[in-house]
Amino acid sequence: MGSDQDIDRPDEPNREPTEGESHSWAVEALRSDLRGRPRPEPAEPERQEGRIPQTRIGRSAKLGTAIGGQATRYAGTAAANVVRSDEKAQERLETRHIETALKMASTLGEMKGAAMKIGQMASFIDVDFLPPEYREIYQKQLSKLRTHAPAMPWERVRMVLEEEYDERPESVFASIEEEAFAAASIGQVHRATLHDGSKVAVKIQYPGVADALESDVANMGILLRLARALAPGLDAKAVASELRERVLEELDYEFEAQNQRTFARAYEGHPFIFVPKVHSRLSRRRVLVTDYVEGRRFDEVKELEQDERDIFGEIVFRFCFGSIYHLQHFNADTHPGNYLLMEDGRVAFLDFGMTKRLTTQQIQLEQRAMDAAGRDDPEGLREALHDLGFVADTSRVDAERLMEHVKMVGGWYLEDKQTEITPKLVMRMIEVTSDPRSDFFDLVRKESLPADELMGRRMETGLLAVLAQLRATANWHRIMREWVYADPPSTVLGEAEWRYFERRGIGQTPGLPSRV
């Protein structure tokens, strides 16, 4: 639930502006943040009063205005600045971008669903629709979609509780706070106390969000069909079906509870990974109740010393990839709001609404592909990617260029060396796979994205972006070898984890014969 638990408390100083605070205060607050100055006194916050827009046309138009409209405003302001003095032009341009960032965050926050997820991703992944020189302004404002998006009024979400429990919330909980402490893309979270005194987090699904997500998925289907013009090998129908299936699962909190129970059992007592316990008796299709977790949010972790950020990054890396090999199951929703650094040094992993299970055969094919790339075997790599579904016709794809392309994208864990993950590195990887100007774009047009691989690539992209925000450094290759070849642990954390899984009797997918 963690994007759902990670939020500033109302009484904390220097909190981010919330929806409804005065426009001028919000602009000056963000400007002060960027320049390291104290903020002005905040205005009184308000809640989101309106309903979530639900129709396909309505949501598509609103999303287009939020994202596409800013490009038009950017161009117009830049043109007008030609006739102004440099200093005044710079100030006006900065103000325009601050206003646009505020509007974008507000609109995406009100829309919830997939639209809000786009905003969350843009807050930590460098994307093309944000002007590079003003990206910090947008990312700082959009980051509140991970931590404190506009919450719905208690009266509206209370109705969901009453419908799901068929009784008053006051009968179910000893107490429940009417003020949400977190608001995410599909639901918001309230602190509560059970009758036995246990502190819990109660995630309540927004009324109307199911219809909104149905519209988002339909709009995504249209975009995927258009994407075939750029990537003819893309099976748009299969990818759209996979997206729809994962979204429907995310809407079912009982399914999420089942996922979270699986991970919580597997990592119970783990030395550095923590997954909160689910209260199954109180969880419903639109209500999820878990143990409440305290911890430092990602923005605070980013300010820690390098060695602490490296440890945090390795823990996230081991959770994201390690669960594939130990559980044949991974969490695809890798964004910074889903991680909390606990007081004892463990990292709490939250929100299991979007996960993916893999077969032994799928994992072994991935191992084959990584092995071929690591051994510099172009023919073997092409064959492995063909078996995975990335290359439909091997005769149309040059094996040497394919190897070069794969090393550009996966070099960070294919090369046996210490590698710092930076935003520039991640942007370069994204460009070689999606930019029509890339030297490899003709190759990309001959490749495909198998529906079964969609969530894996989503996880990997999100993980990379998280590591880039941390500027985490490690020999990612040596850690990966622990799973691909069943090599001995390569770090102190790896040794602790190996002892844990051995003690618990949790094995992993058999590794390939080790090749050094």
What are these regions (language model features)?
Residues 326-336:
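Catalytic-loop of the protein kinase fold
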Residues 363:
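Short adenine-binding "F-helix/F-box" segment of the Bergerat
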